[in-house]
Amino acid sequence: MAEKKGSSSEKTLYCSFCGKSQHEVKKLIAGPSVFVCDECIDLCNEIIRDELPSGSEAGEARSDLPTPAEIKATLDGYVIGQEPAKRTLAVAVYNHYKRLRHKESAKKDDVELTKSNILLIGPTGSGKTLLAQTLARTLNVPFVMADATTLTEAGYVGEDVENIIQKLLQSCNYEVDRAQQGIVYIDEIDKISRKSDNPSITRDVSGEGVQQALLKLMEGTMASVPPQGGRKHPNQDFLQVDTTNILFICGGAFSGLEKVIENRTEASGIGFGAAVKSKKARSLTEAFKDVEPEDLIKFGLIPELVGRMPVIATLAELSEDALVQILTEPKNAVVKQFSKLLAMEGVDLEIRPSALKAIARKALARKTGARGLRSILEQSLIDTMFDLPTTSNVAKVVVDESTIEENKPPLLVYREAAKKA
């Protein structure tokens, strides 16, 4: 339907797609024996735009893939110390997304690059979770964090492992292509270890069964996820998400693993001819450096799961100096956060070096790592922050060592005194 003869001698042209005449549209473009109107062109552009975003955004996220040095530099801005772990993570993540690029352009006969999931081992409060969160922010990819302790086998009360993929989809507005190239961080992975080496007659619904379910996700499977709205739309088809290219990072404190490592590395013989060795007390940092896959299996992880996490990064225990740095140096440091809160009241915050060291010592004594720093400082400032909104003329709050060690109230400097000084 390209043209029709009207009552007059001139021909009226019609769009070959929608059938509208040249008088009903703004523009009619001619081709070889066909015509297309501006409205049909706009409609085609809209259809193409609706179908492209997920793929194009996923490409954009990796088009400017940062180098390992750039990834580490970003991590340095948020995580103090842990140099070996940051270097290991930077290289592993860079290689993972480089592998995805290779897969898109690879031919049939090319070498197939396999995925390398990551295991982070380190004491509580050493920065495992923060490293994973910062990585995802650096790469601009979908990220979700899951707690392994809440996971159970399918059919039991608790979270199914496929709920992790649903949360990943939610984080990127249900764009399947983007989710398939995201990062999943599973915390407390050590808490789902087998309770014993011998299989029990009772079901271990939150231990080995969960490990088996996670294994399927890690090695790559088609996960069926309810569409947006879930049960509200029971007639909708389930979304199929391929987990082959999702990077899994697992983290855990692995309390007790150091004993397994020591038993392996310091095994001694029995009898009169055996060499007598005194067991030296080693720090967690030194012990974790010697970790081998067999130690993780002995600890309670199934061999198949250990095999799916070839990259192992160990995090060191934080020293007093490192904790002082964490208090002040990172972009979102605890001291900077409290300074910002008090600045909203028009008050300056001064924390003296002796107080910073006292906070670090207290956190070390509590064995909470960097996670305990905020609670210690908050506890010292809670009464002051309660009174500040109703107290006038306060210019500065000063926290010294006695505030932390002896629970004395911080020193308040008033505006008149500040002017005289």
UniProtKB/Swiss-Prot annotation:
Zn(2+) binds at C15, C18, C37, C40. It comes from the Bacteria. SMART domains: AAA, ClpB_D2-small, zf-C4_ClpX. The keyword Nucleotide-binding applies. Keywords: ATP-binding, Chaperone, Metal-binding, Nucleotide-binding, Zinc. Pfam families: AAA_2 (PF07724), ClpB_D2-small (PF10431), zf-C4_ClpX (PF06689). One of its GO terms (molecular function) is zinc ion binding. The keyword DNA-binding does not apply. One of its GO terms (cellular component) is HslUV protease complex. One of its GO terms (biological process) is proteolysis involved in protein catabolic process. HAMAP family: ClpX. ATP-dependent specificity component of the Clp protease. It directs the protease to specific substrates. Can perform chaperone functions in the absence of ClpP. Belongs to the ClpX chaperone family. Component of the ClpX-ClpP complex. Forms a hexameric ring that, in the presence of ATP, binds to fourteen ClpP subunits assembled into a disk-like structure with a central cavity, resembling the structure of eukaryotic proteasomes. This is ATP-dependent Clp protease ATP-binding subunit ClpX. It comes from Polaromonas naphthalenivorans (strain CJ2). The gene is clpX.
